[in-house]
């Protein structure tokens, strides 16, 4: 959800309601298309900073009061009315007030970790990968499950990044076609893109970025 900060008031193209409708429609269409492959599908979602319920630009409720999680729930709830379709999917996302804002998922001998990335607040310098690595180390030090992931996935910073040192840390690109904030604070040009990769016992393979000059090129 955009326009959740004061400086974005006049830069958003859509209202809050329309953004939720677009997100919901996009998720549903992607899942329906993936279902045509005839493979079991696991849908996972974690809350990010733009989904937070805000007042005067500040989050003031709990971590699960988040539009990112709400949209995930809307998608699952809609699919439940088609039992034949619903059984093809597994939905995983935090929803209880006591849940963590990260997820882990075991696949082919790997433990995948998922975090939006807004919680990478300190340590590791100014680059996103350094912040992600410092955060990941601290999670392991605190004995949190996501800290033991050998493949950590995050977003938030809009551009693709990757580090293997020795755990694999992957920053996914965004579809928005650019973030003025990231460009001005990190010097990174953020191109619209979709990240995909495969998993086997050896880890992540076939890492691919479907990248275009603009999100409009994905139509």
Residue map of PLM features:
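Acidic carboxylate-rich catalytic motifs and surrounding loops in phosphoryl-/glycosyl-chemistry enzymes
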Residues: 40-49, 89-101
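Catalytic phosphate/metal-binding cores of nucleic-acid and nucleotide-processing enzymes, i.e., regions
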Residues: 21-24, 43, 105, 213-219
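Charged interaction patches that mediate protein-protein contacts
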Residues: 2-9, 207-219
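Core catalytic region of metal-dependent phosphoesterases/phosphodiesterases
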Residues: 1-81
């Amino acid at each position: 959800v955009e326009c959740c900060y004061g400086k974005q008031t006049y830069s958003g193209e859509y209202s809050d309601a329309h953004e939720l409708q677009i997100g919901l429609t996009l998720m549903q269409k992607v899942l329906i298309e993936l279902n045509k492959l005839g493979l079991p599908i696991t849908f996972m979602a974690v809350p990010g900073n733009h989904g937070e319920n805000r007042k005067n630009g500040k989050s003031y409720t709990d971590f699960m009061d988040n539009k990112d999680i709400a949209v995930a729930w809307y998608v699952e709830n809609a699919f439940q009315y088609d039992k034949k379709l619903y059984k093809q999917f597994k939905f995983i996302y935090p929803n209880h007030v006591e849940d963590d804002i990260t997820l882990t998922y075991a696949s082919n001998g790997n433990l995948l970790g998922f975090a939006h990335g807004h919680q990478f607040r300190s340590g590791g310098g100014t680059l996103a990968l350094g912040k992600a690595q410092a955060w990941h180390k601290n999670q392991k030090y605190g004995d949190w499950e996501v800290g033991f992931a050998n493949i950590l996935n995050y977003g938030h910073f809009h551009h693709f990044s990757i580090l293997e040192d020795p755990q694999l840390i992957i920053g996914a690109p965004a579809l928005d076609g650019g973030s003025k904030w990231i460009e001005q604070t990190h010097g990174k040009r953020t191109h619209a893109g979709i990240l995909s990769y495969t998993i086997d016992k050896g880890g992540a393979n076939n890492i691919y970025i479907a990248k275009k000059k603009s999100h409009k090129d994905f139509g």
